[in-house]
Amino acid sequence: MRIGKVKESILKRSVLRQLHNHSEEGSPASGEDAGVLFMPEFSEDAGVALSVNPIEGWTFAAKRAVYGAVNSMLAAGAKIRAISLSLLMPQDTEEKQLKFLMKEIDALCTQEDILVISGHTAVSPFVSTLILSVTAMGIQKKKEEARAEYTDLDLVIAGTIGREGAAMIATEHANRLEERYAPSYIETAKHLFDDGSMSAVSDILQEREVISIHDVREGGIFAALWEMAAAKNVGLSVDLKNIPIRQHTIEVCEYFNLNPYMLRSGGTLLLACANGARLVEQFQKAGIESAVIGQTTSGNDRLIHYDEEARFLEPPKMDEYYKV
């Protein structure tokens, strides 16, 4: 199988179809950022939201872990309360690396008001780099009945695409970028992911106009668009030029011949909403770059427009980060 997320067809055929114990309390699904377990014996109007985010490698591991947990809960309409960590490290790991990682995680959890309530820490001969699995837990208020139709909604991006991957590449391959760019420019690129949490705009995400939210991560915005369309059974019409992206991300991608629209984009949310222009205005007032990039449509056509040309969006492929 290819590197990265398994194909949607494999996920449905070999994972979801093998899980038969479903109930009204909770069921697995593809294209969702978290699962929700409702327990009427404890609460009639709220459930426990759970998400799992795997982190590979040491680069920005703490930020990717905590920000990923926060944003996946926000996308699920939940308030994050705690995380659980599972760390597998290679045999050449030094204790100071582990201590530094946990100090970073603790500082970010304090910033986001999150508890670390359980975990597992081990050295394994079966891994060659850090594997950090983060289980996020939050409270989701019971929603109104799901909409029957998700067509004719505005598609909005909050945050810029590709900055997680660009920051990681700039950090890991700074010496190669120095062949073309000034050290100060590369240093700025390394910090593209510093503001990766969307918790500051959680109130905006609760607006009634917001119908669906998806956390843009592995596979980039193209993968997120496909996953949202597949989950809601809609088509898409997207204007590529409207997708917000920082110049540093473009430069990093051009140097390594990468497609920024298929590059991991932690710290960015994709929203389907009834009034995109109003939502964009609110995000921009909060200091978040945002834009209406298209609409959901009836049927299954998922179209990407650039100037006068249009092409079909393809199913998610391997994240561009792995090509470097």
Where are these regions (language model features)?
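Helix-biased detector of long, well-ordered alpha-helical tracts
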Residues: M1-V324
